[in-house]
């Protein structure tokens, strides 16, 4: 890949062997199939602004909006996919930087749909940087890998010691109400995250790898009885992490629970990880919002607005 070097390196991932056939319609990474987005936020005259915006379709951000009534100084940027989802051969790069003392919220306009594939795969590389005293909420909507799809995502995160990042992914195991074979019917879902300090010290790395036919999916304490999962990172100073963990109540009921969730500490005193599973997306989203509300209150001293009506 000439547009973005690290994106080309993803093709060497072990799990992609057997998925490198070129699509018949348009070759992988052709013009129109490489989306790029760069967002830079900084503090200017006491206000956080989107000072750097670069986009290449099918990824699009138009401008920063200030619609969060609880944090009117928070620039909000919904990422729009003009292609209506991710197709075979698509390659995306997303770079987000929050400067010193600035804050931002980045989300998506709706679910991230990964369409059915008969050749190749789709890949995404993300760089997320939060500088000293910065605060970023990067919470994309749920990812839905369709039957037969192959998707690989790599996220590299750099967070200063006194900054806070709330980032994570929610995944629905296919279009569960569309077809009996949709549930975990995708060929490949590979998502890895690496967290470092500005000096390069690695704090944490995790990889989720689900391949078609993996029997562990049906195990108890994995996904038996559930169709949605979420992993949400809260990278924050140790004192703040301790207060958040103390306030968050583990949700675990032995009586046919709609959702199960809990918080654990990240290695190297880097922060916290929320893990949640649920029956439907709204069950898991409720757990994410419960965690999100506590994080915002402890870090910024601001409440989380009620769920928008369009949700």
UniProtKB/Swiss-Prot annotation:
InterPro entries: UreD (IPR002669)
Recorded GO CC terms: cytoplasm
Pfam families: UreD
Compartment(s) of residence: Cytoplasm
Alphabetized UniProt keyword annotations: Chaperone, Cytoplasm, Nickel insertion
Superkingdom per UniProt: Bacteria
Molecular-function GO terms, alphabetical: nickel cation binding
Major subcellular site: cytoplasm
Keyword Cytoplasm: yes
Keyword Chaperone assigned: yes
Family of the protein in this entry: Belongs to the UreD family.
Assembly, per entry: UreD, UreF and UreG form a complex that acts as a GTP-hydrolysis-dependent molecular chaperone, activating the urease apoprotein by helping to assemble the nickel containing metallocenter of UreC. The UreE protein probably delivers the nickel.
Function: Required for maturation of urease via the functional incorporation of the urease nickel metallocenter.
Name of the protein this chain belongs to: Urease accessory protein UreD 3
Gene (name only): ureD3
């Amino acid at each position: 890949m000439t547009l973005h070097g690290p994106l080309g390196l993803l093709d060497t991932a072990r799990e992609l062997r057997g998925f490198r056939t070129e699509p018949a319609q348009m070759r992988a990474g052709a013009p129109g199939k490489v989306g790029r987005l760069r967002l830079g936020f900084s503090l200017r005259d006491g206000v956080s602004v989107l000072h750097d915006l670069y986009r290449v379709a099918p990824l699009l951000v138009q401008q920063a909006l200030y619609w969060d009534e609880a944090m009117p100084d928070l620039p909000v940027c919904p990422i729009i996919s003009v292609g209506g989802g991710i197709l075979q051969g698509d390659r995306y790069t997303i770079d987000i930087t929050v400067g010193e003392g600035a804050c931002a919220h980045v989300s998506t306009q709706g679910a991230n749909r990964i369409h059915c594939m008969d050749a190749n795969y789709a890949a995404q590389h993300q760089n997320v940087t939060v500088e000293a005293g910065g605060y970023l909420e990067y919470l994309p909507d749920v990812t839905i890998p369709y039957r037969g799809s192959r998707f690989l995502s790599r996220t590299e995160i750099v967070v200063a010691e006194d900054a806070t990042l709330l980032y994570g992914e929610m995944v629905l195991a296919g279009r569960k109400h569309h077809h009996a074979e949709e549930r975990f019917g995708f060929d490949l879902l590979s998502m890895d995250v690496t967290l470092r300090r500005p000096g390069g010290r690695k704090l944490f790395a995790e990889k989720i790898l689900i391949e078609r036919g993996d029997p562990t999916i049906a195990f108890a304490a994995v996904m038996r009885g559930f169709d949605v999962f979420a992993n949400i990172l809260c990278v924050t100073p140790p004192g703040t992490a301790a207060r958040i963990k103390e306030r968050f109540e583990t949700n675990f009921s032995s009586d046919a629970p709609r959702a199960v969730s809990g918080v654990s500490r990240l290695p190297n005193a880097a922060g916290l990880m929320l893990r949640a599973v649920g029956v439907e997306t709204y069950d898991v989203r409720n757990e994410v919002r419960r965690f999100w509300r506590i994080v915002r209150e402890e870090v910024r001293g601001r409440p989380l607005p009620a769920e928008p009506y369009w949700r």
